[in-house]
């Protein structure tokens, strides 16, 4: 398993024109930047690729995929702060110090847009509607980050895992006849890291959820058969 540490000067893997065209129709950021001919980059991340932030970091916007934000201390201890999905942004936290820094890691294949802050500021000055959009977006980011903190603050590891699966199904789910497929390949070890548990506990809980038919597995991806029923199980615990 290789980690690819990315920085501002690296050569990113290009995204195909067909994918760009598809994303431009459904992503408001990309659509606006293309309309205004604003300079930006689009690149792909493979599973476990990492972006490390410094004070010169750009604004990054997720077009597709799922990433986790980590606070990394100089003793290599890591704290997961949030799970990011399509249309979320990151890079606007610039509080790195000599004690810690921030990084994001791709949980699966992801497509990300990056743009200089100076360009964003120029757009805000010339397009008031974009400024309103940006403020609303940052408020939603704050709400989502708070939601994630609520998830990992549950005393019950089972509740944490169920809440995380429901969150992922909401943002990365694909509707099927037998339920919602979480379109991510995430190991039990990574799930454990996200919610502050261990692989053995996660394996035990998932096995129990499979046995009680709340979820099933399809090619290493989780299917939630009835999200409402699963959330009721969570609320009744």
Swiss-Prot record:
Protein name as it appears in the record: Putative HTH-type transcriptional regulator ycf28
Source species of the chain: Porphyra purpurea (Red seaweed)
InterPro entries in the record: cNMP-bd_dom (IPR000595), cNMP-bd_dom_sf (IPR018490), HTH_CRP (IPR012318), RmlC-like_jellyroll (IPR014710), Tscrpt_reg_HTH_Crp-type_CS (IPR018335), WH-like_DNA-bd_sf (IPR036388), WH_DNA-bd_sf (IPR036390)
Keyword Nucleotidyltransferase: no
DNA-binding region per UniProt: 188-207
Keyword Amino-acid biosynthesis applies: no
Places the protein is found: Plastid, Chloroplast
Keyword list, A-Z: Chloroplast, DNA-binding, Plastid, Transcription, Transcription regulation
Top-rank taxon: Eukaryota
Chief location of this protein within or outside the cell: plastid
Matches recorded under PROSITE patterns: HTH_CRP_1, HTH_CRP_2
Pfam families: cNMP_binding (PF00027), HTH_Crp_2 (PF13545)
Cellular component terms (Gene Ontology): chloroplast
GO MF assignments: DNA binding; DNA-binding transcription factor activity
Domain HTH crp-type: 155-228
């Amino acid at each position: 398993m290789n980690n690819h540490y990315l920085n501002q000067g690296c050569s990113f893997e290009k995204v195909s024109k067909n994918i760009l065209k598809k994303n431009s129709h459904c992503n408001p950021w990309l659509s606006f930047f293309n309309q205004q001919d604003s300079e930006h980059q689009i690149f792909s991340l493979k599973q476990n690729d990492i972006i490390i932030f410094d004070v010169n970091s750009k604004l990054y916007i997720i077009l597709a995929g799922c990433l986790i934000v980590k606070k990394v201390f100089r003793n290599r201890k890591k704290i997961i702060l949030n799970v990011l999905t399509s249309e979320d942004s990151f890079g606007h936290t610039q509080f790195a110090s000599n004690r810690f820094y921030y990084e994001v890691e791709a949980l699966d294949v992801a497509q990300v847009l990056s743009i200089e802050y100076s360009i964003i500021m120029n757009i805000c000055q010339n397009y008031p509607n974009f400024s309103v959009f940006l403020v609303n977006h940052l408020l939603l980011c704050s709400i989502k980050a708070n939601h994630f903190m609520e998830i990992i603050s549950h005393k019950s590891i089972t509740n944490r895992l169920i809440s995380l699966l429901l969150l992922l199904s909401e943002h990365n789910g694909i509707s099927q006849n037998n339920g919602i497929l979480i379109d991510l390949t995430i190991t039990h070890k990574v799930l454990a890291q996200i919610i502050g548990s261990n692989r053995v506990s996660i394996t035990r809980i998932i096995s129990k959820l499979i046995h009680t038919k709340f979820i099933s597995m399809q090619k290493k991806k989780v299917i939630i058969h009835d999200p409402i029923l699963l959330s009721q199980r969570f609320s009744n615990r």
